[in-house]
Amino acid sequence: MERYEVIKDIGSGNFGVAKLVRDVRTKELFAVKFIERGQKIDENVQREIMNHRSLRHPNIVRFKEVVLTPTHLAIVMEYAAGGELFERICSAGRFSEDEARFFFQQLISGVSYCHSMQICHRDLKLENTLLDGSIAPRLKICDFGYSKSSVLHSQPKSTVGTPAYIAPEVLARKEYDGKVADVWSCGVTLYVMLVGAYPFEDPDEPRNFRKTITRILSVQYMVPDYVRVSMECRHLLSRIFVANPEQRITIPEIKNHPWFLKNLPIEMTDEYQMSVQMNDINTPSQGLEEIMAIIQEARKPGDGSKFSGQIPGLGSMELDDIDTDDIDVEDSGDFVCAL
């Protein structure tokens, strides 16, 4: 890690700590996720790294490399200077329909690419969508800790994600299509951008997860009267929020929906993105064997010492599991901020 100097902390979670760093040589800024060596370097971490490494798209945070310190495994990635989309909504209250569409188009573009690479995200939410620092912000999907590759793994069965965003079939705890479940989560994200609240939470009891789950299973939601939403947008939401995953709208169908196509920037078209990916294909990345060797070494506990004053020994922060009795749901983020 001598190559990077730490600028500041930029986040923490059940994974550990994230820091903003600068490449000493190029002066380029990166975000680094530090995960304590030893037991925390599990299959989820390995899957996150391997899946993230394979993705190269303008709407996905770019993976750079993994580095080993005496105490931590460091995942170096593109820095999104605009922060979380979640924070932007908290500040704005809610978005206009045009602004919501602008971000939704980018979200669907990134998710569509993930699915084309046979990777479903399984934890799509506002906190996992970052923005770059440009005036017309580019959305960047991040955090592939729950992602599943249908090339490397069987169909998902586990109930993971954040309760407000989870699809009914995931809660049923049967085998499900992760791509179709991602569509539901995209719908929740769109709704929150438009309304400034979660579609399936009781406003009087937002922390009552059991009630939220009941509402999800019965697809009980409404767009409040005070929010002006076009009929085309309402139609799209009604096609996303369908309990039967086989009848739910697919990503390709969303990309052909009239509401989605309105004001679609040229860089969001499939033709344009294909040309970008072809140009990007020769960009060198850290080798697979090197990454696997680093992950394997990181499974051994660290030496417990501080690292050269630059990267201090870092603690980690565990989030409480949600108590939903017989339903196992993981809480991986904040829920609501006075929406």
UniProtKB/Swiss-Prot annotation:
One of its GO terms (biological process) is abscisic acid-activated signaling pathway. GO terms for cellular component: cytoplasm; nucleus. It catalyses: L-seryl-[protein] + ATP = O-phospho-L-seryl-[protein] + ADP + H(+); L-threonyl-[protein] + ATP = O-phospho-L-threonyl-[protein] + ADP + H(+). ATP binds at residues 10-18, 33. It comes from the Eukaryota. It holds the Pfam family Pkinase. Its EC number is 2.7.11.1. The C-terminal region is necessary for the kinase activation in response to hyperosmotic stress. This is Serine/threonine-protein kinase SAPK2.
